[in-house]
């Protein structure tokens, strides 16, 4: 097992074997998906056998495409992570933009009198210089004085400027109130009305829509058809995957999200027919009921919930609105509507589920680097998305370390692919600044780093070494 405090990607003490049931786990948030894409490309080129793909957070995107042998869509020149549309993901919601625009416009309006005074500071020196050279000012000073008297008359700027500021701020308040009212539709909410206006600052809707748009390009091929709704497309996806499990390139799929209302993690799984019963079979009825509350079979009646699972995985807790999921009336939750989102700690649950499904070795890919000790400090971020990203990346790194330590008690073959250094934060879709190299790094470099790390940390030292052992008759 990899020592969590050792260098990134150090191999497991137990040898890798291509004969064993293998799972690929992708975990992370935001731009981590680009790192996953690079690692997937390397694993694809090396022909690494993968039986199960599992995802948490943005790792669900890579897992979805890898499960149907479509991972090339992630790293192609016109693929998911090389498209210009990626730069607009997780943008600021309308409310923060309205507030900023209203405040900026109000400041500009209030600054008009100061601008008028500043013009006088320019006019008087010009008038003085013109008089000194004998050119004459042409009444420049007199014209400015007349303008100032007119502008600062009681019925002019002193009256209209406060009205304009009030109009701008009032319009912004009405827009925020309308946004809060529309967001409150659906489930009953508690608390004063004005708290509805203070919604999470980022929007995750575009990320889920973009995922399904690229998936539709993969599924439809060259045919020119209108894209169906995410629910319909998810249903087609699950049917295609269920019908082709066992065929080359098609793999079992696991997704983990968090339910805010039931206070538990939910697992959405599409596994082979021989393992579907293992998802729910337990020794006692109480344990079986718990499984029905937490585990959903995407090959059965829960196939329509795949779209919900993807949307929730791409939902950043606190930073974006939780995704609502409505369960079937005959399901365990009896038609209730719950709020679901991502949770970094659900990686632990994902590893436990994989082990219960008979997985014998795991390849874990994370873009969150492990701190190697002292002398690793960097300047903290002060921008809004940068501050949120720093916490998320730190939490992801800690969860990876804890999940590996917990899973070690049940499995010794866990191989980790992660960068030693990553200056691109989870929300830096246009690239990030690297203090160590004193330059900006585009998102494409993170994809390339995932490719290189997969070869350097896993394929060459682990998979290559296993081939030598197989040739010598070792397992």
Positions of the model-derived regions?
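Patatin-like phospholipase
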Residues: 1-56, 64-475
């Amino acid at each position: 097992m990899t020592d969590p405090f050792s260098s990134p990607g150090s191999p497991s003490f137990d040898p890798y074997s291509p004969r064993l049931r293998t799972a690929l786990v992708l975990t992370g948030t935001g731009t981590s998906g680009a790192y996953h894409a690079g690692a997937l490309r390397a694993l694809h080129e090396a022909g690494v056998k993968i039986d199960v793909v599992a995802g948490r957070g943005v790792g669900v995107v890579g897992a979805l495409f890898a499960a149907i042998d479509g991972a090339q869509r992630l790293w192609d020149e016109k693929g998911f992570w090389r498209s210009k549309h990626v730069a607009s993901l997780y943008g600021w919601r309308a409310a923060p933009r309205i507030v900023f625009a209203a405040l900026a416009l109000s400041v500009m309006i209030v600054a008009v009198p100061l601008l008028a005074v500043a013009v006088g500071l320019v006019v008087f020196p010009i008038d003085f210089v013109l008089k000194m050279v004998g050119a004459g000012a042409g009444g420049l000073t007199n014209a400015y004085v007349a303008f100032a008297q007119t502008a600062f008359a009681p019925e002019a700027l002193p009256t209209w400027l406060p009205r304009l500021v009030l109009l701008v701020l009032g319009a912004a308040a009405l827009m925020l109130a309308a946004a809060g009212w529309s967001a409150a539709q659906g489930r009953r909410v508690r608390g004063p009305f004005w708290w509805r206006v203070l919604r999470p600052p980022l929007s995750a809707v575009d990320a889920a829509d973009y995922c399904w748009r690229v998936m539709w390009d993969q599924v439809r091929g060259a045919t020119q058809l209108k894209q169906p709704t995410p629910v319909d497309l998810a249903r087609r996806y699950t049917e295609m995957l269920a019908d082709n499990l066992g065929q080359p390139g098609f793999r079992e799929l696991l997704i983990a999200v968090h339910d805010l209302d039931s206070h538990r993690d939910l697992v959405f799984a599409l596994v082979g027919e021989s393992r579907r019963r293992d998802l729910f079979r337990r020794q006692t009825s109480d344990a079986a009921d718990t499984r029905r509350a937490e585990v959903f079979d995407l090959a059965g009646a829960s196939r329509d919930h795949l779209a919900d699972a993807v949307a929730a995985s791409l939902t950043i807790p606190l930073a974006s609105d939780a995704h609502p999921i409505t369960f079937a009336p005959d399901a365990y939750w009896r038609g209730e509507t719950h709020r679901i989102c991502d949770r970094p700690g659900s990686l632990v649950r994902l590893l436990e589920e994989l082990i219960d499904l008979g997985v014998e070795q795991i390849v874990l890919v994370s873009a969150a680097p492990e701190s190697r000790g002292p002398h690793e400090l960097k300047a903290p971020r002060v921008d809004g998305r940068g501050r949120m990203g720093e916490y998320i990346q730190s939490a992801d790194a800690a969860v990876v370390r804890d999940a590996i330590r917990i899973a070690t008690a049940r499995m010794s073959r866990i191989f980790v692919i992660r960068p030693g250094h990553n200056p691109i934060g989870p929300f830096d879709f246009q690239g990030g600044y690297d203090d160590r190299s004193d330059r900006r790094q585009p998102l494409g470099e993170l994809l390339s780093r995932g490719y290189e790390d997969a070869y350097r940390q896993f394929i060459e030292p682990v998979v290559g070494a296993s081939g030598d052992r197989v040739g010598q008759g070792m397992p």
